[in-house]
From Swiss-Prot:
Organism: Bacillus velezensis (strain DSM 23117 / BGSC 10A6 / LMG 26770 / FZB42) (Bacillus amyloliquefaciens subsp. plantarum)
Protein name: Ketol-acid reductoisomerase (NADP(+))
Keywords: Amino-acid biosynthesis, Branched-chain amino acid biosynthesis, Magnesium, Metal-binding, NADP, Oxidoreductase
Family: Belongs to the ketol-acid reductoisomerase family.
Lineage: Bacteria, Bacillati, Bacillota, Bacilli, Bacillales
GO molecular function list: ketol-acid reductoisomerase activity; magnesium ion binding; NADP binding
Chain positions recorded as substrate binding sites: S251
UniProt domain KARI C-terminal knotted: residue ranges: 182-327
Xref: PANTHER family: KETOL-ACID REDUCTOISOMERASE, MITOCHONDRIAL
Enzyme Commission number(s) of this protein: 1.1.1.86
UniProt enzyme class: oxidoreductase
The keyword Membrane appears for this protein: no
Protein residues bound to NADP(+): Y25, G26, S27, Q28, R48, S52, D82, E83, Q84, Q85, G133
Residues at which Mg(2+) 2 binds: D190, E226, E230
Length: 342
């Protein structure tokens, strides 16, 4: 059974006298920095010159280059996209990691897959809120919080767990509950969820349903409504009440269709494919492919992305969403399964 920690379980004043550097000031960085600051913790921000630098200053933070922030800090939280972390770490953080400091992440990818190899004389842990930055910030302001994960990779001081929990408390996570895990478990389950269910599996399912209807002669607009637009209603019900709560809220006809047809679509073969996806994550195949793809400037990524953006479901969706003033249009990218961009 997972171990969960709350505010009352966490030692007081663990971060007193320590300086925390937030590296990156996107959605998560913004939330972490403000929440920690309002929790009475000494926070600075390390970020490149640009909009994020200016925004951090306007929010009242002391802002430095990444190297300068890392040099000053006792605790360095890296909140950059996975694919940027190794380069920034090697160029601007590594040499500032003197003995006794703590190196912190919100996702274990680069440490688990050995793209970042921390020195042996620093603590290494992760604190990962299970929600996007705007939610981490909003719930904190409301006196609540978003559940978070923490894991210890390297405990040189003997105090890494206390420090990790104190950090989680500082961003509001311990108000909701902080769950203990490992870098391996956090990384592999996060990647699997993204690939097999939340992003890869779901988008493939939606497209397959849309194509099945349109290829059978149904109007693409109706196919869009039934296979994509109405998804939010169902997901919101599952989010709030679980599968059983969702089924309670839908019609009996829909529920019966769920029972008899769902297993025909997601059958044993699909589950076997999911197991292969998990194996590729566990043995490092996916990580190697993604690392190489970034090293050669993402030719496959860019080609697939361009092709997907031209799918009929996108064209129909853009037209239909113009009829829906209640749907926010635009390019806002608030990722719920990863840390925010710098």
């Amino acid at each position: 059974m997972v171990k969960v920690y709350y505010n009352g379980d966490i030692k007081e004043n663990v971060l007193a006298g320590k300086k925390v550097a937030i590296i990156g000031y996107g959605s998560q960085g913004h939330a972490h920095a403000l929440n920690l600051k309002e929790s009475g913790i000494d926070v600075i921000v390390g970020v490149r010159q640009g909009k994020s630098f200016t925004q951090a200053q306007e929010d009242g933070h002391q802002v430095f280059s990444v190297r300068e922030a890392a040099a000053q800090a006792d605790i360095i939280m890296v909140l950059l996209p996975d694919e940027q972390q190794q380069k920034v770490y090697e160029a601007e953080i590594k040499d500032e990691l003197t003995a006794g400091k703590s190196l912190v992440f919100a996702h274990g990818f680069n440490v688990h897959f050995h793209q970042i190899v921390p020195p042996a004389d620093v603590d290494v842990f992760l604190v990962a809120p299970k929600g996007p930055g705007h939610l981490v910030r909003r719930t904190y302001e409301q006196g609540a919080g978003v559940p978070a994960l923490f894991a210890i990779y390297q405990d040189v001081s003997g105090e890494a767990k206390d420090t990790a929990l104190a950090y989680a408390k500082g961003i509001g996570g311990a108000r909701a509950g902080v769950l203990e895990t490992t870098f391996k478990e956090e990384t592999e389950t996060d990647l699997f969820g993204e690939q097999a269910v939340l992003c890869g599996g779901l988008t493939a399912l939606v497209k397959a349903g849309f194509e099945t209807l349109t290829e059978a002669g149904y109007q693409p607009e109706l196919a869009y409504f039934e296979c994509l637009h109405e998804l939010k209603l169902i997901v919101d019900l599952m989010y709030e009440e679980g599968l059983a709560g969702m089924r309670y809220s839908i019609s009996d006809t829909a529920q019966w269709g769920d029972f008899v047809s769902g297993p025909r679509v997601v059958d044993a073969k699909v589950k076997e494919s999911m197991k292969q996806v998990l194996t590729d994550i566990q043995n490092g195949t996916f990580a190697k492919e993604w690392i190489v793809e970034n090293q050669v400037n993402r030719p496959r990524f860019n080609a697939i992305n361009a092709s997907e953006n031209e799918h009929q479901i996108e064209k129909v969706g853009r037209q239909l969403r113009e009829m829906m003033p209640f749907v926010k249009q635009g390019k806002k990218k608030e990722a719920v399964v990863s840390v925010a961009q710098n």
